[in-house]
Each structure stands twice: as structure tokens, then as C-alpha cells.
């Protein structure tokens, strides 16, 4: 699927890793953060990837003499494409770019339509348009961000057509903007906080709102933000070690500058690439995404991922002077100094804390993508491990001391964290097995006993082991949530029974019926 060809363009090891990250992002949800020094080929990677992918465009044209004819043409086009007429008039339909032209007194309406999103585009011939189909490389929007840039420089802006002489409402000029490009790279995005905040919303919602015009719902294939490493040379960039808010990006890839010979080889290959036809089309990406989504994950690998997430999202902060915390909480919700905690020796969250939800979802997505790119039918433990290296570094709140222990390298810190996780799994194997079995059976009593909350059982030594306490506590929370759902379900059934009774019963029976329902 062109993955090998794309990887072969870049000779450096970190470029190979980043290439896999980009392709994995492309066949999942398209949100990637690239971290690397200048000259690491970050921009070149995005341009090269977009040039390998093509799509078929239907270029529909129609001449007109007045506004009425434009209105009729767009109305018939909107009906044929199955899109909202007002959005089409304002150029707010993704996959369609509208232009007006006036050459030698001949006025022309042009619709450039991506057939991957609008399969009915060739049928505009039936509406009086002349339609020409052509295969094009996918466009990319690559911009080096500066602190003074305005958001409008990136999202496009409303314009009034000169051809229609003000007789027509404004429409969006979006050709050279993120509202139109399927591949986007904003290099050094974080030097402009206002733009970064706007892009934060765009990455998640895939929407851009234009005051007085409307909203366009985009569907980019890949959104990449690039930033430099955190050191004295790049003071304006975010401190990735403590930027848990960056977890909107599914994948983070670290890219270093290759050796001089690799640089020359890569430049030569990129020059040749300009004359190489695209290798895959846009619909292939959509098909791959569907296959990746359906791919299963090996049970043992998924279970270990859940155990890791549980221990990284649990805090039992307690000091020798205070009563020990019985139930865990999110490390992000309390102010604490881990070095003072009595549980610090068996707590993994002291090294790196992560919010479970996006971490687990992202690792599963990326593990499936990594397995797919390797030609597998299911994601295995090695795929989950590879995904963790893409998903955890930018998402965790790291201990500064732990980062320094690992030479200031976040990737090494991930290795150290996983080594400690594996060590605790082996050391407390029987206790972990007990928690897992109790969780699967819904055995709340055993979980309470492990946590020291069962008044009918003696305190266990394992109750002082934060690693096991975290697993038991998270399992108990899931059991509690299940019980609450069951109770809510029963309450809903009661309410429905009461409603039906009151609708059908006579006045004399009403009070008795309500009392019966309460019981």
C-alpha cells in the first residue's frame, strides 16, 4: 500500500520510525505530532506522502450570463451531489471547490469535485455542466508558522465575487488553506499560541466557523503539527514532558537529523519523486481505515495495555503523618509530592501519569495500524508495545527526575517505565492474577479485601503495594459503574411501569398502583 516505497525515501533510522508513524496516522485518524530539530525532513515527509496519493476530480464547468443562471446551476448541482444548496453557494462543502471566471466577456462557473467524497460528480453532465475527469495528486498545505500570523492566513476567508458584481452573497476562498487541503503541516505551530488554540479545536472537531458565512465540516486525511525539541535553543516551544493537553494528537514521532550521506541520498530521491506517478488513490486510504478498525487485538496484549493504563492513572498519595488513602484518584486531580508518599516504591504513576481514556483508545488504534502495515491479521504484543512508544511520550505528565535519569530522553524514559511495569508484573504475578480473575467475575468482595476495605477480612500485606492497589481499585470502579448502570436500568423500568399504569388505571387504582410500583 505504498508504505514500503514511502519509507524507502528516507535513509535515517529516525526518519524510518517517523515514516511509519505518519502512515499509521494516515490509516487511523490522521493526527500526528512531529518533534525534531531543523533539517530533519519533517516538511518533506508530508509533501512526499501527499504526492504518493491521487484522487479523481470531476471538473464541472458552465457558462452563465446572470445571477439567476448561477442560482439554477448550483441548485441542480446541489441536488445531484446530495449537499446543502446554501453551503454549496458559499463554498462550504468539503471536497468541492467553487470558482468564478470571466475571460473575454465569457462568465464561467467551475466546480472542482473530489470523487472520493462525491461519487455523483460525473452526473453533473445531466444538469448542463461540461464535465472533465482527471487524476491529480492530493494537495498539501505546509506552512512555517510565525508569531505574527493571523488565523485567517490558514483557514481562508470570505470574498465577494467580482464576476457577479456584488449581486451574490460572499463565498469562502479556500483553495490555499486548511479548509481545502487533505494534508496539513504547521511547522513550529506552538510559537503562535492563538493559532495553536484555534488548531486545537480544528484537530478535534474538524470544523471551521466563519462569522457571517457559516461552518465548513472538513475531513482532512492527515494533520501534522511540528515542533522542535525542548532545550535552550528552542525557548518558544511547549515543554513536552508536562504537556498532557497534547493528547489530542494520536501519535507523536521524534525525528533527528540524518547523517550527511543519508541527507544527499534523501534529497536525490525526493527530486526523482516529482516525476513518479502516484502509487495509490484516496479511496484506498478509506478502505484501509475500515480494515484497520475491524482488526482484532490479541487478548493478552490488550489485557496488559489495560493493566498499564490502570497503574498510570491511579494515585494513593499518603504521607506517614496522614491516614493512608484507601481509594485511588487521578494523579491530575490532586497536588502532591511523590517523594513524600509512603507508596512511592511500588507506584508507577510517580514516573509518568496519564489519563486512561485517550491513551487506551489511541494505543489500540495505532497498534492495529502498525500490525496492518506489517501485513498481520491481528495486533500482537509487539504491535501494542510499538504503539505505546508513539502514544505515551507527549501524552504523559512525566517526572522531571525520571526524565533526567534517562538522559533527558523521553523515549528512553518510556523504555524505563515499561521495564518497571514488567518487573512489577513478575514480582506480584499471583496478586495481579487474583485481581484480574476477580474483575472478570465481578467479585467485589475479593477486590475490597485486597484494598483493605472488607470489614470481614483481615488486612493483607499486598494492601501496601501501590501497583496492586491501583489494579484492584480500578477494577472496583468498573464494578461499581456496572452496578450503577444496572440500578439505573431497573429505575428506568420502574418509571416506565408507573407511567403505563397511570395511563391505563382508573382513579381508584392509581394510589395502589403507585405504591405497588414503589415496592
Give the location of each predicted region:
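C-terminal engagement/docking regions of AAA+ P-loop ATPases
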Residues: 38-44, 331-519
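Canonical AAA+ ATPase core
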Residues: 53, 57, 162-164, 183-196, ...
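Walker A/P-loop
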Residues: 24-146
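Conserved C-terminal "switch" segment of AAA+ ATPases
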Residues: 10-12, 252-341, 376-377
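Conserved alpha-helical scaffold flanking the Walker A/P-loop in AAA+ ATPase domains
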Residues: 21-25, 124, 128, 158-184
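Conserved RecA-like P-loop NTPase ATPase core
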Residues: 22, 34, 154, 187, ...
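Helical mechanochemical/support elements of P-loop NTPase systems and associated helical scaffolds
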Residues: 14-18, 45, 146-151, 191-196, ...
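Pre-Walker A (pre-P-loop) alpha-helix and adjacent loop at the N terminus of AAA/AAA+ ATPase modules
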Residues: 2-40
Amino acid at each position: 500500500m505504498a508504505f514500503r516505497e514511502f519509507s524507502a525515501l528516507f535513509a535515517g533510522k529516525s526518519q524510518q520510525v517517523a515514516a511509519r508513524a505518519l502512515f499509521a496516522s494516515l490509516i487511523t485518524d490522521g493526527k500526528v505530532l512531529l518533534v525534531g530539530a531543523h533539517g530533519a525532513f519533517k516538511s518533506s515527509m508530508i509533501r512526499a506522502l501527499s504526492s504518493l496519493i491521487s484522487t479523481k476530480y470531476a471538473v464541472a464547468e458552465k457558462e452563465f450570463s446572470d445571477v439567476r443562471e448561477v442560482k439554477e446551476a448550483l441548485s441542480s448541482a446541489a441536488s445531484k451531489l446530495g449537499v446543502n444548496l446554501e453551503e454549496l453557494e458559499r463554498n462550504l462543502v468539503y471536497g468541492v471547490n467553487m470558482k468564478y471566471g470571466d475571460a473575454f466577456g465569457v462568465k464561467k462557473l467551475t466546480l472542482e469535485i473530489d470523487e472520493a467524497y462525491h461519487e455523483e460528480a460525473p452526473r453533473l453532465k445531466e444538469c448542463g455542466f461540461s464535465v472533465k475527469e482527471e487524476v491529480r495528486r492530493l494537495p498539501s498545505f505546509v506552512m512555517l508558522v510565525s508569531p505574527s500570523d493571523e488565523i485567517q492566513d490558514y483557514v481562508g476567508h470570505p470574498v465577494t465575487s467580482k464576476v457577479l458584481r456584488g449581486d451574490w452573497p460572499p463565498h469562502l476562498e479556500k483553495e490555499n488553506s486548511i479548509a481545502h487541503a487533505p494534508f496539513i503541516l504547521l511547522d513550529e505551530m506552538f510559537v503562535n499560541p492563538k493559532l495553536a488554540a484555534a488548531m486545537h479545536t480544528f484537530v478535534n472537531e474538524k470544523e471551521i466557523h466563519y462569522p457571517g458565512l457559516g461552518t465548513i465540516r472538513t475531513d482532512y486525511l492527515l494533520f501534522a503539527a511540528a515542533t522542535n525539541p525542548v532545550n535552550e535553543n528552542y525557548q518558544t516551544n511547549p515543554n513536552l514532558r508536562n504537556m498532557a493537553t497534547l493528547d489530542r494528537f494520536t501519535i507523536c514521532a521524534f525525528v533527528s537529523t540524518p547523517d550527511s550521506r543519508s541527507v544527499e541520498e534523501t534529497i536525490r530521491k525526493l527530486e526523482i519523486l516529482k516525476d513518479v506517478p502516484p502509487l495509490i488513490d484516496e479511496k484506498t486510504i478509506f478502505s484501509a481505515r475500515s480494515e484497520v478498525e475491524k482488526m482484532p487485538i490479541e487478548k493478552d496484549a490488550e489485557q496488559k495495555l489495560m493493566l498499564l493504563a490502570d497503574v498510570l492513572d491511579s494515585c494513593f498519595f499518603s504521607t506517614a503523618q496522614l491516614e493512608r488513602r484507601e481509594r485511588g484518584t487521578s494523579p491530575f486531580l490532586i497536588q502532591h509530592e511523590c517523594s513524600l508518599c509512603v507508596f512511592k516504591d511500588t507506584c508507577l504513576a510517580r514516573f509518568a501519569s496519564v489519563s486512561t481514556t485517550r491513551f487506551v483508545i489511541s494505543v489500540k488504534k495505532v497498534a492495529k495500524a502498525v500490525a496492518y502495515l506489517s501485513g498481520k491479521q491481528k495486533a500482537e504484543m509487539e504491535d501494542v508495545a510499538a504503539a505505546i512508544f508513539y502514544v505515551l511520550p507527549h501524552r504523559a505528565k512525566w517526572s522531571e527526575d525520571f526524565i533526567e535519569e534517562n538522559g533527558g530522553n523521553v523515549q528512553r524514559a518510556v523504555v524505563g517505565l515499561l521495564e518497571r511495569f514488567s518487573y512489577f508484573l513478575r514480582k506480584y504475578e499471583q496478586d495481579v492474577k487474583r485481581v484480574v480473575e476477580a474483575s472478570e467475575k465481578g467479585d467485589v468482595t475479593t477486590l475490597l479485601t485486597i484494598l483493605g476495605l472488607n470489614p470481614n477480612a483481615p488486612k493483607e500485606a499486598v494492601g501496601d503495594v501501590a501497583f496492586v492497589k491501583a489494579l484492584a481499585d480500578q477494577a472496583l470502579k468498573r464494578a461499581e459503574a456496572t452496578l450503577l448502570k444496572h440500578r439505573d436500568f431497573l429505575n428506568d423500568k420502574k418509571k416506565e411501569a408507573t407511567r403505563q399504569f397511570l395511563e391505563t388505571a382508573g382513579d381508584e387504582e392509581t394510589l395502589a398502583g403507585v405504591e405497588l410500583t414503589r415496592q
